[in-house]
Structure formats: structure tokens, C-alpha cells
Amino acid sequence: VVNGKPTRTNVGRMVSLKYRNKHI
């Protein structure tokens, strides 16, 4: 559970950064 919670948050943040970079 501990490994799953932070992993999902990290993925979301990485995706957001990549998506924002592509949008710009």
C-alpha cells in the first residue's frame, strides 16, 4: 500500500509535467 500510494502520485506528477511540456 505504501509503495502503491507514492508510486501513483509520482506517476501523476511526471505525466502532468510531460503533458504540460507537450502542450506548451
Curated annotation (Swiss-Prot):
Any GO MF annotation of the entry: heparin binding
Keywords, in A-Z order: Disulfide bond, Growth factor, Heparin-binding
Complex and partners: Heterodimer of a heavy and a light chain linked by disulfide bond(s).
Function: HPTA is an acidic heparin-binding growth factor for hepatocytes.
Protein name listed in UniProt: Heptapoietin A light chain
